[in-house]
Amino acid sequence: MATRIRLQRHGRKSYAFYSIVIADSRAPRDGKFTEKIGTYNPNTNPATVDLNFERALHWVLVGAQPSDTVRNILSREGVYMKKHLLGGVAKGAFGEAEAEAKFEAWKNNKQSGLSALKAKEEEAKKAEAKARLEAEKKVNEVKAKALAEKKAAEEAAKAAAEAPAEEAAPAEEAATEAAAE
């Protein structure tokens, strides 16, 4: 039986997530499968992978061929690194304890790189939010200044309209007094 490790699609339109399954290569994509070894959700950032490491390693060791995407997932999770190290142990290049130490060192290095990437993304988000807030403050200051100028112009126009009316009122009173005399 030609066994494949591949993705089985689930989810709604434009929002797919996948099960990582062991299936016969002749079976339909979403059809019959031998074993489910994990899930893959590419919609999150970074993509979420939940994988049964031991079963994935077992199937790779017995010769199951992964699809391109699954090969990348298994490589990122360390299944292929572990297979490589177990091959070195089988050849007698080094011991199993040394292989475990190398694998743990590789895994820790991978985790530190991932955490640094997440921290960098978080810092970029904070900087972007701060820049957006500063830009909004500047726009609000310009709007407030324009509004204050408009109110000052209205007050000046209102004061100018009242001043001639006040000057005209005493002149009218004087004219009425002169006519009365």
Curated annotation (Swiss-Prot):
GO terms for cellular component: cytoplasm; small ribosomal subunit. GO terms for biological process: translation. Residues 150-181 are annotated as: Disordered. InterPro entries: Ribosomal_bS16, Ribosomal_bS16_dom_sf. GO terms for molecular function: structural constituent of ribosome. Keywords: Ribonucleoprotein, Ribosomal protein. Pfam families: Ribosomal_S16 (PF00886). Signal peptide: none annotated. Coiled coil: none annotated. Residues 158-181 have a biased composition (Low complexity). Belongs to the bacterial ribosomal protein bS16 family. PANTHER family: 30S RIBOSOMAL PROTEIN S16, SMALL RIBOSOMAL SUBUNIT PROTEIN BS16M. HAMAP family: Ribosomal_bS16 (MF_00385). This is Small ribosomal subunit protein bS16. It comes from Bacteroides fragilis (strain ATCC 25285 / DSM 2151 / CCUG 4856 / JCM 11019 / LMG 10263 / NCTC 9343 / Onslow / VPI 2553 / EN-2).
